[in-house]
Curated annotation (Swiss-Prot):
One of its GO terms (biological process) is negative regulation of DNA-templated transcription. Pfam families: CoA_binding, Put_DNA-bind_N. It comes from Pelotomaculum thermopropionicum (strain DSM 13744 / JCM 10971 / SI). Residues 16-55 bind DNA. Modulates transcription in response to changes in cellular NADH/NAD(+) redox state. Homodimer. SMART domains: CoA_binding. Belongs to the transcriptional regulatory Rex family. This is Redox-sensing transcriptional repressor Rex. One of its GO terms (molecular function) is DNA binding. NAD(+) binds at G90, A91, G92, N93, L94, G95. It is found in: Cytoplasm. One of its GO terms (cellular component) is cytoplasm.
Amino acid sequence: MKALKVPEATITRLSVYSRFLERMDRNGIVTVSSGEIAEGVGVSSAQVRKDLAYFGEFGTRGVGYNVKDLMHYTSKILGLNEPWPIVLAGAGNLGFALCTYKGFNDRGFTIVGVFDNDLTKIGKKIVDLEVYPPERMPEVIAKHKVRIGIIAVPARAAQEVADQMVKNGLQAILNFAPVVLNVPDHVLLRNVDLSVSLEVLTFNLVQKESQAG
């Protein structure tokens, strides 16, 4: 089956649509129009229709979309129709926040192992997860058939952690460390740098002020 070439922005919006549809379903809404989705998530109705068109034909002209059906389809497209076990490297403040974030479980993502090389953290628990030394990562990955890893360690340790994850068969990495990682082409890598996001905001604020002044 040929892989779809879909813009990343479309995938991001699809995730937002999926959450919106879940809220509609919880509120007992049966059908929804592209205009209502657009208003609910802050895009145009044309954008909603264009995004969905990448994946097929949905809904009925003049009627709209069945909420449960579209919710099912978007979840399936995003791969959320199956559980996703995850390993997390880093038991510091960020690691703790990630472990206690309920949104992961709500979307089918479950952290099954937390690892740190800090002897003061090893053996302690975050919620119901014991912090393991890095040497136990292969065991946990194999046991739970893990394909995704999260890196929440200092920049100086991130590449070594990424190498260990790749060596043990992980196929995708979400990296919170503020450093460029080198991984093989077959490994999916997504970087999340909170400082960069803040700098984008400060840039736009400065531009807005200069235009106003």
